[in-house]
Amino acid sequence: MEEKGLTVSAYDLREMLEKKEPVVVLDVRPKEQREEWQIPGSIYVDAYKRLNANDPAVLDEIELPTSGKVVTVCAAGKTSKIAANELRKRGIEAYSLEGGMKGWSLAWNTAWKQFDGFSVCQVRRTGKGCLSYILSSEKEAIIIDASLPVDVYAQLIKQHQLSVKYVIDTHIHADHLSRSKELAEYFHAPLYLPSNNKVQFVFNPITADTVFTIGSFVLEPIPTPGHTFESTSFLGNDEILLTGDTLFVDGVGRPDLKANSEEALNKSKLLYQSLQTLLSLPGEVIVLPAHTGKAVDFDEKLIQASLGKVMKSVPMLSLSEEDFINTLLKRIPATPENYLSIVDKNLKGDFSDINPVELEAGANRCAVS
C-alpha cells in the first residue's frame, strides 16, 4: 500500500475492498452528505462538527477493531486526517482517504456474467454510480457508456484478451464525462453515437438500420427518446436490454435536464412512449441500466433485473400517460452538480482544460422513482 503519512489513496482502498482485505471504512462527514452517497460497507459516526471543534472524544463512542486497518473519509480529506490521527493515538492503524469522497469518485469494481454465446462485464464506477459495459463474444468486444479513465478499460480488455470492435454511447451524458471518444481513439475502434445529437466531433451515427455484431452476439438499437432526445437503448441477442438512462431497475429517467418547463413536458411524453416500447418486450429480458442510485458493493453481482420484475417494482410504469407525466414532473430530484458544463464538454469531446474529479463531483441524480 502506498502511503503518504496518514493517507491512503482511493486506488489502494479500492484494491483492499476488492481483495476483501480486513479494513473498516469510517465516514465522518455531515449526515446529509452521507445520505447522498457513501462508500459501500462503510460505517458512520456523526463526528464532523466535533472533530473540527477540537473534540475528538466523539471517536470514543464507536467500537473499532484493534487489528486491521481503519480508513477515515470526509468530503475532501481534511477532517478525516484529524480522525485518523486521533485513532492512531488510541493504538489503531488508521489512515485518511486521500482526496476524500472527491478522490473516491473514480473508484470502480466489476461484475461478470456468462450468457449463452456472450459475456457481460458491468464496470461499476462505485464512487458515482455510473455503469458501463464490456460485451464480448469470441474474443471481440463492444464497450458501452464508458465513464472511467481509458486505462481501466484497457486493463480489463488486456486481462481477458479481447479485441475492441465498437465503442458506443447511449446518449449525451450530463452527470459524467464520456470517455468513449478517447477510448475509441485508443483502441482504433469506430465510435458510434445516436444520430440526433449536437456533438462537435466526428462519429458514426446510429440509425434504425445499424446492427452491431461480435462473434455470435448481435446488438440492435431501439430509439428511446425522453431522458434526452437522442437516447437509445440496445437489445442484445433478445436476452439483454441496455437501457442507458431511460429505464433503471428501480425507476425511470428524468426529462428535465437542459429543458424549460414546456420542453420537459414534451420529453416526458416521449419518455412514456419509449417506455411502452421497452415494456412490450418479453418479460424475461434482462435490464442493464447506465446508472444506479446506490453505492455499488464489491460483490461481483450484476446490477440487473428482468423486465418483468422492473415492471412490478416500479409503480410509475403501470400509470396512464397523463398520470405518469404528472407524477414524473412532481418527483424530479435536484439537478446534478455542474451538469451544464459536463454536457458542454461531452459535446466538444475535449477535457484537456479541466480537472475531471472536480467537475464530476456530486451525487448521482439521474433517476425518478
Located regions from the model:
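Catalytic cysteine-centered active loop of the rhodanese-like fold, especially the PTP/DSP P-loop
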Residues: 45, 56-102
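Conserved beta-strand hairpin/beta-sheet module of binuclear metal-dependent hydrolase folds
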Residues: 30, 112-160, 234-243, 250
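Active-site environment of divalent metal-dependent phosphoester hydrolases
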Residues: 31-32, 76-79, 150-151, 172-178, ...
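Active-site neighborhood of phospho(di)ester-bond hydrolases with catalytic His/Asp-centered motifs
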Residues: 74, 143-146, 163-173, 192-196, ...
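Active-site HxH/HxHxD metal-binding segment of metal-dependent hydrolases
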Residues: 85, 129, 141, 149-222
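A contiguous binding-surface segment within folded domains or other stable secondary-structure elements
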Residues: 237-287, 291
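Positively charged, proline/Ser/Thr-rich regional signature most characteristic
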Residues: 2-70, 148, 359
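Accessory terminal helices/loops
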Residues: 1-7, 85-90, 110-111, 273-286, ...
